[in-house]
A protein has these predicted regions:
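Short active-site oxyanion
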Residues: 36-40, 59-61, 146-147, 206-207, ...
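Active-site phosphate-binding/coordination module
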Residues: 23-119
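Hydrophobic packing residues within well-ordered alpha-helices of enzyme cores
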Residues: 50-54, 160-163, 221, 237
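Hydrophobic residues within well-ordered alpha-helices
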Residues: 32, 67, 194, 220-224
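Asp-based, Mg2+/Mn2+-dependent phosphohydrolase catalytic module
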Residues: 223, 227-247
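Asp-based phosphoryl-transfer active-site loop
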Residues: 3-18, 221
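Short, structured coil segments at secondary-structure junctions
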Residues: 56-59, 67, 166-169, 223-224, ...
């Protein structure tokens, strides 16, 4: 019997650039939870943004946020993995130096930005609807850094090789969308988040289900038996799913 369901958001639960979860999905999730199934959005997004998305059921869910750097269930932190601060600041400086790239730095409940363009500021605060804090210097951040997100407004395909080649031996580097690439501690991925939920509730992979579509979902798909990949996903990701779905 399935007791835990995790789903990626962008490209999976949210299709075609949608930035809100439709009411029918919320109602279905509520029915699952009422039957004793644990549901967790598993996303590169911040936890504050995730809770806004799920509205009326937000306090009933588990959360695998920041690609697994922060895991929470009903307000209790199950897992939290921060980046080495010195390394994080070096990566931030590198992102800033890239002409088409913006940086977003994740704390536990807010994300820090110093926008180069009004377009990026609007996207993060109005489109994605993140809780953001403007900073003059990223060295002023006085909490743990959980994740660094690179946003290339021309498409992350144009800059991903730079970050993969430069940082993949020191950090976990994952493409998380058409515009985004995430860097975390080497131990962080959605699969680790799934493991922490499984350990907390004493669940086996055969009791777990996950849905995903992108490279940052692979580790999560590998940790459950019922692994569903979206039909539009690239073949490298589809290899990690037992099932293919188009909703």
């Amino acid at each position: 019997m399935v007791k835990f369901v995790a789903s990626d958001l962008d490209g999976t639960l949210l299709l075609n650039g949608a930035q809100s979860v439709d009411e029918s999905t919320i109602q279905y999730i509520n029915k699952l939870v009422d039957k004793g199934v644990i549901f967790a959005p598993a996303s590169g997004r911040q936890i504050t943004s995730l809770k806004r998305l799920f509205g009326a059921v937000s306090d009933k869910l588990a959360y695998i946020a920041e690609n697994g750097a922060l895991v929470e269930y009903k307000g209790e932190t199950i897992g939290k993995t921060a980046m080495d601060r010195k390394l994080a600041l070096e990566i931030i400086e590198d992102v800033i130096e890239q002409p088409n790239c913006e940086v977003l730095v994740s704390g536990e409940h807010t994300s820090y930005i110093k926008p180069k363009s009004q377009e990026y500021y609007y996207r993060m605060t109005k489109v994605v609807n993140y809780h953001t804090t403007l900073v003059d210097k990223f060295t002023d951040i006085d909490e743990d850094i959980l994740k660094i997100a690179v946003c290339d407004m021309t498409g992350i395909k144009n800059s991903k090789e730079h970050f993969i080649n430069k940082w993949s031996d020191k950090a976990s580097v994952l493409v998380s969308g058409e515009l985004y690439l995430d860097l975390m501690d080497t131990n962080v991925n959605k699969g680790r988040g799934i493991e922490q939920v499984q350990q907390y509730f004493g669940l086996k992979p055969e009791q777990c289900m996950a849905f995903g579509d992108n490279y940052n979902d692979i580790a999560m798909l590998d940790k459950v038996y019922y692994s569903y990949v979206m039909e539009k996903a690239v073949e490298d990701v589809k290899k990690h799913g037992r099932f293919v779905t188009g909703w």
